[in-house]
Amino acid sequence: MNKLPHETRVVIGMSGGVDSSVAALLLKEQGYDVIGIFMKNWDDTDENGVCTATEDYNDVIEVCNQIGIPYYAVNFEKQYWDKVFTYFLDEYRAGRTPNPDVMCNKEIKFKAFLEHAIALGADYVATGHYARVAYMDGEYKMLRGVDDNKDQTYFLNQLSQEQLSKTMFPLGELKKPQIREMAKEAGLATAAKKDSTGICFIGERNFKDFLSNYLPAQPGVMQTLSGEVKGKHDGLMYYTIGQRHGLGIGGNGDPWFAVGKNLKENILYVDQGFHNELLYGDEVIATNVGWVSNKEKETEFKCTAKFRYRQEDNKVTVQIVDENTVRILCDEPIRAITPGQAVVFYDGDECLGGATIDEVYRSGKKLDYLG
Protein backbone atom coordinates (compact mmCIF):
# COMPACT_ATOMS: atom_id res chain seq x y z
CA MET A 1 0.00 0.00 0.00
CA ASN A 2 1.34 3.41 -0.96
CA LYS A 3 1.98 5.70 1.97
CA LEU A 4 0.96 9.35 2.01
CA PRO A 5 3.86 11.85 1.97
CA HIS A 6 3.57 12.67 5.69
CA GLU A 7 3.84 8.93 6.46
CA THR A 8 6.89 8.57 4.18
CA ARG A 9 10.32 9.10 5.70
CA VAL A 10 12.97 10.45 3.32
CA VAL A 11 16.56 10.70 4.55
CA ILE A 12 18.46 13.19 2.42
CA GLY A 13 22.22 13.41 2.06
CA MET A 14 23.21 17.04 2.58
CA SER A 15 26.63 18.38 1.62
CA GLY A 16 26.24 21.99 2.69
CA GLY A 17 25.76 23.06 -0.93
CA VAL A 18 22.82 24.78 -2.60
CA ASP A 19 21.64 21.70 -4.54
CA SER A 20 21.06 19.39 -1.57
CA SER A 21 19.66 22.34 0.44
CA VAL A 22 16.95 22.98 -2.18
CA ALA A 23 16.31 19.24 -2.56
CA ALA A 24 15.60 19.07 1.20
CA LEU A 25 13.38 22.16 1.00
CA LEU A 26 11.32 20.66 -1.85
CA LEU A 27 10.80 17.38 0.02
CA LYS A 28 9.69 19.26 3.12
CA GLU A 29 7.28 21.41 1.05
CA GLN A 30 5.86 18.23 -0.52
CA GLY A 31 4.94 17.03 2.97
CA TYR A 32 7.47 14.24 3.50
CA ASP A 33 8.96 13.31 6.88
CA VAL A 34 12.48 14.55 6.07
CA ILE A 35 15.75 13.97 7.94
CA GLY A 36 18.99 15.64 6.81
CA ILE A 37 22.24 13.68 7.02
CA PHE A 38 25.71 15.12 6.56
CA MET A 39 28.16 12.45 5.42
CA LYS A 40 31.71 12.86 6.67
CA ASN A 41 33.72 10.76 4.23
CA TRP A 42 37.15 12.29 4.57
CA ASP A 43 39.31 13.75 7.34
CA ASP A 44 40.20 16.99 5.60
CA THR A 45 41.86 18.86 8.43
CA ASP A 46 44.47 21.10 6.82
CA GLU A 47 47.96 21.96 8.11
CA ASN A 48 46.48 24.77 10.24
CA GLY A 49 44.07 22.38 11.93
CA VAL A 50 41.07 23.82 10.06
CA CYS A 51 38.52 21.28 8.83
CA THR A 52 36.49 22.45 5.82
CA ALA A 53 33.87 19.78 6.55
CA THR A 54 33.03 21.67 9.76
CA GLU A 55 32.07 24.75 7.71
CA ASP A 56 29.93 22.60 5.41
CA TYR A 57 28.23 20.91 8.37
CA ASN A 58 27.51 24.30 9.92
CA ASP A 59 25.78 25.27 6.66
CA VAL A 60 23.75 22.03 6.81
CA ILE A 61 22.70 22.82 10.40
CA GLU A 62 21.65 26.35 9.44
CA VAL A 63 19.65 25.18 6.40
CA CYS A 64 17.95 22.35 8.33
CA ASN A 65 16.96 24.80 11.05
CA GLN A 66 15.58 27.18 8.40
CA ILE A 67 13.58 24.40 6.73
CA GLY A 68 12.55 22.86 10.04
CA ILE A 69 13.94 19.33 9.74
CA PRO A 70 16.14 17.27 12.09
CA TYR A 71 19.75 16.63 11.07
CA TYR A 72 22.65 14.34 11.96
CA ALA A 73 26.25 13.84 10.90
CA VAL A 74 27.42 10.32 10.04
CA ASN A 75 31.03 9.26 9.67
CA PHE A 76 31.83 7.03 6.69
CA GLU A 77 35.58 7.70 6.65
CA LYS A 78 36.57 4.05 7.04
CA GLN A 79 34.22 2.80 4.33
CA TYR A 80 35.34 5.63 2.04
CA TRP A 81 39.01 4.82 2.57
CA ASP A 82 38.47 1.08 2.01
CA LYS A 83 36.09 1.27 -0.96
CA VAL A 84 36.89 4.52 -2.75
CA PHE A 85 40.28 5.93 -1.84
CA THR A 86 42.13 2.60 -1.98
CA TYR A 87 40.67 2.03 -5.46
CA PHE A 88 41.70 5.58 -6.44
CA LEU A 89 45.34 4.94 -5.46
CA ASP A 90 45.41 1.45 -7.00
CA GLU A 91 44.26 2.83 -10.36
CA TYR A 92 46.89 5.58 -10.36
CA ARG A 93 49.51 3.01 -9.41
CA ALA A 94 48.46 1.01 -12.47
CA GLY A 95 48.93 4.06 -14.71
CA ARG A 96 45.19 4.60 -15.20
CA THR A 97 42.90 7.57 -14.52
CA PRO A 98 40.21 6.61 -11.96
CA ASN A 99 36.76 8.08 -11.44
CA PRO A 100 36.21 8.23 -7.66
CA ASP A 101 32.79 9.88 -7.98
CA VAL A 102 31.34 6.78 -9.67
CA MET A 103 32.75 4.56 -6.92
CA CYS A 104 31.60 6.92 -4.16
CA ASN A 105 28.01 6.81 -5.44
CA LYS A 106 28.09 3.03 -5.78
CA GLU A 107 29.72 2.21 -2.43
CA ILE A 108 28.99 5.14 -0.11
CA LYS A 109 26.04 7.35 -1.06
CA PHE A 110 23.81 4.55 -2.35
CA LYS A 111 25.14 1.71 -0.21
CA ALA A 112 26.61 2.67 3.19
CA PHE A 113 24.38 5.75 3.42
CA LEU A 114 21.32 3.88 2.13
CA GLU A 115 21.83 1.12 4.73
CA HIS A 116 22.20 3.75 7.47
CA ALA A 117 19.04 5.53 6.31
CA ILE A 118 17.02 2.31 6.32
CA ALA A 119 18.20 1.72 9.89
CA LEU A 120 16.69 5.14 10.68
CA GLY A 121 13.36 3.93 9.32
CA ALA A 122 13.70 5.57 5.90
CA ASP A 123 11.40 4.64 3.06
CA TYR A 124 13.69 6.48 0.63
CA VAL A 125 17.00 8.28 0.43
CA ALA A 126 17.38 11.47 -1.57
CA THR A 127 20.32 13.48 -2.88
CA GLY A 128 20.84 16.71 -4.79
CA HIS A 129 21.93 14.91 -7.97
CA TYR A 130 20.61 16.04 -11.34
CA ALA A 131 18.93 12.82 -12.48
CA ARG A 132 15.45 11.26 -12.54
CA VAL A 133 13.97 7.91 -11.52
CA ALA A 134 10.88 6.57 -13.27
CA TYR A 135 8.97 3.32 -12.83
CA MET A 136 8.04 2.01 -16.29
CA ASP A 137 7.46 -1.40 -17.87
CA GLY A 138 7.72 -3.15 -14.51
CA GLU A 139 11.12 -1.77 -13.51
CA TYR A 140 12.95 1.35 -12.39
CA LYS A 141 14.67 3.45 -15.02
CA MET A 142 17.26 6.16 -14.48
CA LEU A 143 16.76 9.15 -16.75
CA ARG A 144 18.97 12.13 -17.43
CA GLY A 145 18.27 15.30 -15.46
CA VAL A 146 16.32 17.95 -17.40
CA ASP A 147 19.30 20.33 -17.14
CA ASP A 148 21.60 18.99 -19.88
CA ASN A 149 24.48 21.03 -18.56
CA LYS A 150 24.22 19.52 -15.07
CA ASP A 151 23.00 15.96 -15.73
CA GLN A 152 24.85 13.56 -13.38
CA THR A 153 23.70 10.15 -14.60
CA TYR A 154 27.28 9.61 -15.84
CA PHE A 155 28.39 9.33 -12.18
CA LEU A 156 25.33 7.27 -11.16
CA ASN A 157 25.74 4.62 -13.86
CA GLN A 158 26.39 1.75 -11.43
CA LEU A 159 23.12 2.05 -9.50
CA SER A 160 20.97 -1.09 -9.37
CA GLN A 161 17.21 -1.72 -9.37
CA GLU A 162 17.32 -2.18 -5.60
CA GLN A 163 19.11 1.15 -5.08
CA LEU A 164 16.86 3.08 -7.49
CA SER A 165 13.72 1.64 -5.86
CA LYS A 166 14.73 3.46 -2.67
CA THR A 167 15.98 6.70 -4.26
CA MET A 168 14.48 10.13 -4.93
CA PHE A 169 16.14 12.88 -6.98
CA PRO A 170 14.05 16.01 -6.21
CA LEU A 171 16.08 18.23 -8.58
CA GLY A 172 15.74 16.03 -11.67
CA GLU A 173 13.07 18.17 -13.35
CA LEU A 174 14.76 21.50 -12.56
CA LYS A 175 17.54 23.63 -14.02
CA LYS A 176 20.35 25.16 -12.00
CA PRO A 177 19.20 28.82 -12.28
CA GLN A 178 15.77 27.79 -10.93
CA ILE A 179 17.46 26.11 -7.96
CA ARG A 180 19.52 29.20 -7.14
CA GLU A 181 16.33 31.29 -7.39
CA MET A 182 14.41 28.94 -5.06
CA ALA A 183 17.22 29.05 -2.51
CA LYS A 184 17.25 32.85 -2.69
CA GLU A 185 13.47 33.15 -2.34
CA ALA A 186 13.50 30.83 0.68
CA GLY A 187 16.41 32.79 2.19
CA LEU A 188 18.52 29.64 2.56
CA ALA A 189 21.99 30.14 4.03
CA THR A 190 23.56 28.36 1.03
CA ALA A 191 21.76 30.38 -1.69
CA ALA A 192 24.92 32.15 -2.88
CA LYS A 193 27.43 29.43 -1.96
CA LYS A 194 29.84 28.55 -4.75
CA ASP A 195 29.50 25.07 -6.28
CA SER A 196 32.26 22.66 -5.31
CA THR A 197 34.36 21.34 -8.18
CA GLY A 198 36.98 18.64 -8.59
CA ILE A 199 37.55 15.57 -6.47
CA CYS A 200 35.90 15.95 -3.06
CA PHE A 201 38.81 14.75 -0.91
CA ILE A 202 41.32 17.01 -2.68
CA GLY A 203 39.18 20.14 -2.53
CA GLU A 204 41.13 23.32 -3.25
CA ARG A 205 44.50 21.66 -2.77
CA ASN A 206 47.07 21.15 -5.51
CA PHE A 207 46.48 17.74 -7.09
CA LYS A 208 50.20 16.92 -7.46
CA ASP A 209 50.98 17.84 -3.86
CA PHE A 210 48.04 15.80 -2.60
CA LEU A 211 48.84 12.68 -4.60
CA SER A 212 52.54 12.75 -3.69
CA ASN A 213 51.52 12.31 -0.02
CA TYR A 214 50.26 8.82 -0.87
CA LEU A 215 52.18 7.68 -3.95
CA PRO A 216 55.90 8.39 -4.41
CA ALA A 217 56.43 10.30 -7.66
CA GLN A 218 58.84 8.70 -10.11
CA PRO A 219 60.07 11.26 -12.66
CA GLY A 220 61.06 9.89 -16.05
CA VAL A 221 61.52 10.57 -19.73
CA MET A 222 58.99 12.27 -21.98
CA GLN A 223 59.36 11.17 -25.61
CA THR A 224 57.57 10.53 -28.88
CA LEU A 225 56.62 6.98 -29.85
CA SER A 226 59.50 7.05 -32.34
CA GLY A 227 61.93 7.68 -29.46
CA GLU A 228 62.62 11.42 -29.75
CA VAL A 229 63.19 12.72 -26.20
CA LYS A 230 61.25 15.93 -25.49
CA GLY A 231 61.95 16.40 -21.79
CA LYS A 232 61.21 14.93 -18.38
CA HIS A 233 57.89 14.15 -16.70
CA ASP A 234 57.20 14.47 -12.96
CA GLY A 235 55.55 11.04 -12.59
CA LEU A 236 53.12 9.18 -14.86
CA MET A 237 50.28 9.47 -12.35
CA TYR A 238 50.13 13.23 -12.91
CA TYR A 239 49.17 12.95 -16.59
CA THR A 240 46.07 11.76 -18.37
CA ILE A 241 45.56 10.89 -22.04
CA GLY A 242 44.90 13.99 -24.15
CA GLN A 243 46.37 16.36 -21.54
CA ARG A 244 48.06 19.50 -22.87
CA HIS A 245 48.87 21.59 -19.81
CA GLY A 246 51.90 20.91 -17.68
CA LEU A 247 54.07 19.23 -20.32
CA GLY A 248 56.45 22.18 -20.61
CA ILE A 249 57.49 21.49 -24.21
CA GLY A 250 58.36 24.72 -26.03
CA GLY A 251 59.11 25.40 -29.67
CA ASN A 252 57.09 26.14 -32.78
CA GLY A 253 54.26 24.25 -34.41
CA ASP A 254 51.18 22.58 -32.97
CA PRO A 255 50.80 22.16 -29.19
CA TRP A 256 51.98 18.95 -27.55
CA PHE A 257 49.70 16.42 -25.83
CA ALA A 258 50.15 13.34 -23.65
CA VAL A 259 49.25 10.43 -25.96
CA GLY A 260 50.29 7.42 -23.85
CA LYS A 261 52.24 5.86 -20.99
CA ASN A 262 54.77 3.05 -20.65
CA LEU A 263 54.47 1.98 -17.03
CA LYS A 264 57.24 -0.63 -17.26
CA GLU A 265 59.86 1.82 -18.50
CA ASN A 266 58.28 4.90 -16.87
CA ILE A 267 57.96 6.80 -20.17
CA LEU A 268 55.34 9.44 -20.97
CA TYR A 269 54.57 9.45 -24.69
CA VAL A 270 53.82 12.83 -26.27
CA ASP A 271 53.01 14.10 -29.74
CA GLN A 272 51.78 17.23 -31.52
CA GLY A 273 48.32 18.25 -32.60
CA PHE A 274 44.90 18.18 -30.94
CA HIS A 275 43.60 15.86 -33.66
CA ASN A 276 46.68 13.62 -33.68
CA GLU A 277 45.74 10.12 -34.88
CA LEU A 278 47.49 8.60 -31.84
CA LEU A 279 44.76 10.09 -29.61
CA TYR A 280 41.88 8.35 -31.41
CA GLY A 281 40.31 4.94 -30.83
CA ASP A 282 37.31 3.23 -32.39
CA GLU A 283 36.93 0.08 -30.26
CA VAL A 284 36.97 -0.40 -26.50
CA ILE A 285 37.00 -3.34 -24.11
CA ALA A 286 35.33 -2.32 -20.83
CA THR A 287 35.00 -4.31 -17.60
CA ASN A 288 33.15 -4.07 -14.26
CA VAL A 289 29.91 -3.73 -16.20
CA GLY A 290 26.81 -2.66 -14.31
CA TRP A 291 23.34 -2.50 -15.89
CA VAL A 292 20.45 -0.57 -14.36
CA SER A 293 17.93 -3.12 -15.65
CA ASN A 294 17.85 -6.75 -14.50
CA LYS A 295 16.28 -7.78 -17.80
CA GLU A 296 18.45 -9.92 -20.03
CA LYS A 297 20.41 -7.92 -22.61
CA GLU A 298 20.67 -8.76 -26.28
CA THR A 299 24.18 -9.98 -27.10
CA GLU A 300 24.60 -6.99 -29.43
CA PHE A 301 22.73 -3.69 -29.50
CA LYS A 302 23.10 -0.09 -30.63
CA CYS A 303 22.97 2.86 -28.24
CA THR A 304 24.96 5.99 -27.46
CA ALA A 305 27.87 6.30 -25.03
CA LYS A 306 29.83 8.91 -23.13
CA PHE A 307 33.50 8.11 -22.51
CA ARG A 308 33.89 11.04 -20.13
CA TYR A 309 31.62 13.46 -18.24
CA ARG A 310 29.95 16.17 -20.34
CA GLN A 311 31.07 14.57 -23.59
CA GLU A 312 28.56 14.59 -26.44
CA ASP A 313 26.71 11.32 -27.07
CA ASN A 314 28.60 8.99 -29.41
CA LYS A 315 26.85 6.32 -31.50
CA VAL A 316 28.16 2.86 -30.63
CA THR A 317 27.41 -0.85 -30.93
CA VAL A 318 27.77 -2.80 -27.67
CA GLN A 319 28.66 -6.50 -27.77
CA ILE A 320 28.28 -8.50 -24.55
CA VAL A 321 31.43 -10.59 -24.03
CA ASP A 322 30.44 -11.95 -20.60
CA GLU A 323 28.56 -10.68 -17.54
CA ASN A 324 31.53 -8.50 -16.57
CA THR A 325 32.86 -7.41 -19.99
CA VAL A 326 31.65 -5.58 -23.10
CA ARG A 327 33.20 -4.70 -26.45
CA ILE A 328 32.21 -1.25 -27.74
CA LEU A 329 32.45 -0.46 -31.46
CA CYS A 330 32.32 3.28 -32.18
CA ASP A 331 30.64 4.60 -35.34
CA GLU A 332 33.34 7.31 -35.50
CA PRO A 333 36.84 7.37 -33.93
CA ILE A 334 36.78 9.11 -30.53
CA ARG A 335 39.52 11.27 -29.03
CA ALA A 336 41.30 10.55 -25.75
CA ILE A 337 39.49 7.42 -24.57
CA THR A 338 41.19 6.89 -21.22
CA PRO A 339 41.68 3.56 -19.39
CA GLY A 340 40.23 3.73 -15.87
CA GLN A 341 37.48 6.19 -16.76
CA ALA A 342 33.80 5.29 -16.97
CA VAL A 343 31.97 4.63 -20.22
CA VAL A 344 28.23 5.15 -19.77
CA PHE A 345 25.49 3.91 -22.09
CA TYR A 346 22.25 5.69 -23.05
CA ASP A 347 19.08 5.06 -25.01
CA GLY A 348 17.72 8.57 -25.50
CA ASP A 349 17.25 9.98 -21.99
CA GLU A 350 17.55 6.59 -20.32
CA CYS A 351 20.87 5.67 -18.69
CA LEU A 352 21.35 1.95 -19.33
CA GLY A 353 24.43 1.46 -17.15
CA GLY A 354 28.18 1.68 -17.50
CA ALA A 355 31.59 0.05 -17.26
CA THR A 356 35.28 0.85 -16.78
CA ILE A 357 37.41 1.47 -19.88
CA ASP A 358 40.11 -1.20 -19.97
CA GLU A 359 41.62 -1.49 -23.47
CA VAL A 360 41.42 0.79 -26.52
CA TYR A 361 41.87 -0.23 -30.18
CA ARG A 362 42.14 1.56 -33.51
CA SER A 363 41.44 -0.27 -36.78
CA GLY A 364 41.66 -3.60 -34.94
CA LYS A 365 45.04 -2.87 -33.32
CA LYS A 366 45.36 -2.51 -29.55
CA LEU A 367 46.83 0.83 -28.47
CA ASP A 368 49.48 -0.62 -26.15
CA TYR A 369 51.00 2.82 -25.63
CA LEU A 370 47.98 3.85 -23.55
CA GLY A 371 49.49 1.93 -20.63
UniProtKB/Swiss-Prot annotation:
<feature type="disulfide bond" description="Alternate">
    <location>
        <begin position="104"/>
        <end position="200"/>
    </location>
</feature>
<dbReference type="InterPro" id="IPR023382">
    <property type="entry name" value="MnmA-like_central_sf"/>
</dbReference>
<dbReference type="GO" id="GO:0005737">
    <property type="term" value="C:cytoplasm"/>
</dbReference>
<dbReference type="InterPro" id="IPR046884">
    <property type="entry name" value="MnmA-like_central"/>
</dbReference>
<keyword id="KW-0808">Transferase</keyword>
<dbReference type="InterPro" id="IPR046885">
    <property type="entry name" value="MnmA-like_C"/>
</dbReference>
<feature type="site" description="Interaction with tRNA">
    <location>
        <position position="341"/>
    </location>
</feature>
<comment type="function">
    <text>Catalyzes the 2-thiolation of uridine at the wobble position (U34) of tRNA, leading to the formation of s(2)U34.</text>
</comment>
<feature type="binding site">
    <location>
        <begin position="13"/>
        <end position="20"/>
    </location>
    <ligand>
        <name>ATP</name>
    </ligand>
</feature>
<keyword id="KW-0820">tRNA-binding</keyword>
<dbReference type="InterPro" id="IPR014729">
    <property type="entry name" value="Rossmann-like_a/b/a_fold"/>
</dbReference>
<feature type="active site" description="Cysteine persulfide intermediate">
    <location>
        <position position="200"/>
    </location>
</feature>
<dbReference type="Pfam" id="PF03054">
    <property type="entry name" value="tRNA_Me_trans"/>
</dbReference>
<keyword id="KW-0819">tRNA processing</keyword>
<dbReference type="Pfam" id="PF20258">
    <property type="entry name" value="tRNA_Me_trans_C"/>
</dbReference>
<dbReference type="GO" id="GO:0103016">
    <property type="term" value="F:tRNA-uridine 2-sulfurtransferase activity"/>
</dbReference>
<feature type="region of interest" description="Interaction with tRNA">
    <location>
        <begin position="308"/>
        <end position="309"/>
    </location>
</feature>
<feature type="binding site">
    <location>
        <position position="128"/>
    </location>
    <ligand>
        <name>ATP</name>
    </ligand>
</feature>
<dbReference type="GO" id="GO:0000049">
    <property type="term" value="F:tRNA binding"/>
</dbReference>
<keyword id="KW-0547">Nucleotide-binding</keyword>
<feature type="region of interest" description="Interaction with target base in tRNA">
    <location>
        <begin position="99"/>
        <end position="101"/>
    </location>
</feature>
<keyword id="KW-0067">ATP-binding</keyword>
<keyword id="KW-0963">Cytoplasm</keyword>
<keyword id="KW-1015">Disulfide bond</keyword>
<dbReference type="Pfam" id="PF20259">
    <property type="entry name" value="tRNA_Me_trans_M"/>
</dbReference>
<feature type="binding site">
    <location>
        <position position="39"/>
    </location>
    <ligand>
        <name>ATP</name>
    </ligand>
</feature>
<feature type="site" description="Interaction with tRNA">
    <location>
        <position position="129"/>
    </location>
</feature>
<keyword id="KW-0694">RNA-binding</keyword>
<dbReference type="InterPro" id="IPR004506">
    <property type="entry name" value="MnmA-like"/>
</dbReference>
<feature type="active site" description="Nucleophile">
    <location>
        <position position="104"/>
    </location>
</feature>
<dbReference type="GO" id="GO:0005524">
    <property type="term" value="F:ATP binding"/>
</dbReference>
<dbReference type="GO" id="GO:0002143">
    <property type="term" value="P:tRNA wobble position uridine thiolation"/>
</dbReference>
<comment type="similarity">
    <text>Belongs to the MnmA/TRMU family.</text>
</comment>
<feature type="region of interest" description="Interaction with tRNA">
    <location>
        <begin position="150"/>
        <end position="152"/>
    </location>
</feature>
<protein>
    <recommendedName>
        <fullName>tRNA-specific 2-thiouridylase MnmA</fullName>
        <ecNumber>2.8.1.13</ecNumber>
    </recommendedName>
</protein>
